[in-house]
């Protein structure tokens, strides 16, 4: 008699994805982030579901309902802060996952990579709309500023913004629809993640060397299940340290002031995980140009397979490319810092230089370094 996990129609799918899956024997901890993202997504959906049971998406009661969750609901405060800080952990894993893909050349799996980029956009949209829901000052003004960017689109811009708002300003209709979208998108993300995994399992995982590992595979369970559990425990520990000791460390104090359309906060800024893109947006003195740069800063990932000029897949044996990659990481950290600073000298010029460097590194310097490395192989 065959094992039930290999014969049952549903169990068979799970078995082939998580138990008997042949995996490369040399994948490092950088390969943990895929499973961690899955765990965070489930955690965010669960905490979000419990928050939605008590939240009201009405401009008059939204702020109070969040206060009610924190004060009156059993363990409401921990659910709320796990959800808010869980988003930060989600983005840390997401950026590391994308960085891993860039470093080790995983973008050569075209379908997997492209769905990954769509997933990144979907998660960013979800996080943005979630930030609007508590209806504090930063929620309201963040929603106003970011949705207003669409008015830069020629001809249809203004109509588009008013259509998204459901009126002539960010108001009750906007909050209600943002709640609806914030609720449905994580389920769409979960479905996309399954498609992402489906395409990955068509080719099998990449590995640090970038060389085919077909000759040396090991079963996913128990080797990588135990490794993933360790990674998950470490990150859950980090999350709980954040939630229990410094729950507001990454938040904005302005969001503890109820939304007021008549009073603009001195510095409007998004959550830390959007600051790099926000810095790129602000560094261009033209509205449409800024919006295009903002979209392209993420959409540029789609071009990664086209910009790959090296004869080697991974950066493991390419010192010049490695150097440029870490300069890119430092550049993104600089942009993140600039995004949180006021628009004044010297931050403006630093932001502009960092923005130029960002696009220059990806579009020009890294492909050039790859070609130089190709020629060095002939020596």
UniProtKB/Swiss-Prot annotation:
Heme b b562 binds at residues 83, 182. Keywords: Electron transport, Heme, Iron, Membrane, Metal-binding, Mitochondrion, Mitochondrion inner membrane, Respiratory chain, Transmembrane, Transmembrane helix, Transport, Ubiquinone. GO terms for cellular component: mitochondrial inner membrane; respiratory chain complex III. The chain crosses the membrane at residues 33-53, 77-98, 113-133, 178-198, 226-246, 288-308, 320-340, 347-367. It is found in: Mitochondrion inner membrane. Heme b b566 binds at residues 97, 196. It comes from the Eukaryota. InterPro entries: Cyt_b/b6_C (IPR005798), Cyt_b/b6_C_sf (IPR036150), Cyt_b/b6_N (IPR005797), Cytb/b6-like_sf (IPR027387), Cytochrome_b (IPR030689), Cytochrome_b_C_euk/bac (IPR048260), Cytochrome_b_N_euk/bac (IPR048259), Di-haem_cyt_TM (IPR016174). It is a multi-pass membrane protein. Its cofactor is heme b. GO terms for biological process: mitochondrial electron transport, ubiquinol to cytochrome c. Its main location: mitochondrion. Binds 2 heme b groups non-covalently. Component of the ubiquinol-cytochrome c reductase complex (complex III or cytochrome b-c1 complex) that is part of the mitochondrial respiratory chain. The b-c1 complex mediates electron transfer from ubiquinol to cytochrome c. Contributes to the generation of a proton gradient across the mitochondrial membrane that is then used for ATP synthesis. The cytochrome bc1 complex contains 11 subunits: 3 respiratory subunits (MT-CYB, CYC1 and UQCRFS1), 2 core proteins (UQCRC1 and UQCRC2) and 6 low-molecular weight proteins (UQCRH/QCR6, UQCRB/QCR7, UQCRQ/QCR8, UQCR10/QCR9, UQCR11/QCR10 and a cleavage product of UQCRFS1). This cytochrome bc1 complex then forms a dimer. Belongs to the cytochrome b family. This is Cytochrome b. It comes from Bubalus bubalis. The lineage of its organism: Eukaryota, Metazoa, Chordata, Craniata, Vertebrata. The gene is MT-CYB.
């Amino acid at each position: 008699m065959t094992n039930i996990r290999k014969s049952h129609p549903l169990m068979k799918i799970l078995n082939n994805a998580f138990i008997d899956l042949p995996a490369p024997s040399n994948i490092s901890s950088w390969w943990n982030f895929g499973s961690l993202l899955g765990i965070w997504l489930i955690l965010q959906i669960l905490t979000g579901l419990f928050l939605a049971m008590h939240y009201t998406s009405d401009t008059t009661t939204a702020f109070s309902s969040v206060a009610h969750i924190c004060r009156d609901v059993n363990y409401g405060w921990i659910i709320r802060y796990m959800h808010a800080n869980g988003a930060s952990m989600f983005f840390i894993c997401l950026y590391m996952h994308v960085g891993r893909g860039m470093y080790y050349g995983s973008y050569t799996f075209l379908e997997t990579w492209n769905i990954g980029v769509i997933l990144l956009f979907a998660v960013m949209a979800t996080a943005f709309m979630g930030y609007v829901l508590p209806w504090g000052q930063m929620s309201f003004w963040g929603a106003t500023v970011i949705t207003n960017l669409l008015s830069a689109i020629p001809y249809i811009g203004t109509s588009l913004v008013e259509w998204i708002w459901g009126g002539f300003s960010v108001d009750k209709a906007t909050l209600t629809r943002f709640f609806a979208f914030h609720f449905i998108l994580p389920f769409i993300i979960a479905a996309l993640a399954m498609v992402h995994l489906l395409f990955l399992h068509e080719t099998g995982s990449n590995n640090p060397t970038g060389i085919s590992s077909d000759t040396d595979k090991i079963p996913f369970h128990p080797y990588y299940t135990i490794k993933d559990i360790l990674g998950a425990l470490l990150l859950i520990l980090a999350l709980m340290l954040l939630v229990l000791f410094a729950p507001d460390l990454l938040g904005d104090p302005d969001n503890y002031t109820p939304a007021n359309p008549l009073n603009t906060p001195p510095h409007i800024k998004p959550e830390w995980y959007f600051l790099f893109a926000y810095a790129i947006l602000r560094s261009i003195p033209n509205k449409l140009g800024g919006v295009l740069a903002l979209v392209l800063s993420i959409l540029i990932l789609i071009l990664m397979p086209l910009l790959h000029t090296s004869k080697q897949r991974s950066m493991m044996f390419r010192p010049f490319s490695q150097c440029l990659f870490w300069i890119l990481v430092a550049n993104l950290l600089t942009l993140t810092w600039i995004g949180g600073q006021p628009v004044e000298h010297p931050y403006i010029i630093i932001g502009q230089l960092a923005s130029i460097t960002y696009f220059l590194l990806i579009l020009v310097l890294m492909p050039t370094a790859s070609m130089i490395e190709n020629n060095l192989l002939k020596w």
